[in-house]
């Protein structure tokens, strides 16, 4: 029997016209949007799934990085956006958004993925303007249009 996350993922794949996508044996489904944004979905349990945006590796040589990350995390949470978190295996900064599975539609999933993508863009640009660069093979500052963001935006 398929979980609610699996059924939603099937409907989402059909909606966006990509055939089939599925969770792997670790209950993760990862994909790249526009060859820039690396997104992972986690089938955590039958109540919610997690949407992760992989922002890049922690820059260990910038003393302001930790303060900027704390500031960004507070800003995102105050505005209903994703949490910032650390993934130790890849030594990377992630944006994580909890997505409840009650009354879900593929459109709602798409909207929440967009919230994570917009938050990734904004975080990347604000950090870049502070002289902080996250090492990320997918996301390049030149590929994201900017109006010199100086403040965080939760993407909603």
UniProtKB/Swiss-Prot annotation:
CDD domains given for it?
T3SC_IA_CesT-like
Q: Where is the signal peptide?
A: none
**TM region(s), chain numbering:** none
Q: What is its main location?
A: cytoplasm
Domain of life from the UniProt record: Bacteria
Intrachain S-S bonds: none
> What does the UniProt entry say about where the protein is found?
Cytoplasm
A single cellular component GO annotation: cytoplasm
Gene Ontology BP, a term: protein secretion by the type III secretion system
Q: Does the keyword Cytoplasm apply?
A: yes
Q: Which keywords appear in this protein's UniProt record, sorted alphabetically?
A: Chaperone, Cytoplasm, Virulence
Stated role: Chaperone for the type III secretion of Tir. Probably stabilizes the protein, prevents inappropriate protein-proteininteractions and aids in secretion.
The Swiss-Prot or TrEMBL record describes its family as follows: Belongs to the CesT/SycH chaperone family.
Report the protein name in the record.
Answer: Tir chaperone
Q: What is the lineage of its organism?
A: Bacteria, Pseudomonadati, Pseudomonadota, Gammaproteobacteria, Enterobacterales
């Amino acid at each position: 029997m398929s979980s609610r996350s699996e059924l939603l993922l099937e409907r989402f794949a059909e909606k966006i016209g990509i055939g089939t996508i599925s969770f792997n044996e670790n209950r993760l489904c990862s994909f790249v949007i526009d060859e820039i944004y690396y997104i992972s979905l986690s089938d955590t349990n039958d109540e919610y799934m997690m949407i992760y945006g992989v922002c890049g590796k922690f820059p260990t040589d910038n003393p302001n990085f930790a303060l900027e990350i704390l500031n960004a995390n507070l800003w995102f949470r105050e505005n209903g956006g994703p949490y910032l978190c650390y993934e130790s295996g890849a030594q990377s900064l992630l944006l994580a958004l909890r997505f409840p599975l009650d009354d879900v539609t593929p459109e709602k999933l798409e909207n929440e993925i967009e919230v994570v993508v917009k938050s990734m863009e904004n975080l990347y640009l604000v950090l870049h303007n502070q002289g902080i660069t996250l090492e990320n093979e997918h996301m390049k500052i030149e590929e994201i249009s900017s109006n010199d963001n100086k403040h965080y935006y939760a993407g909603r």
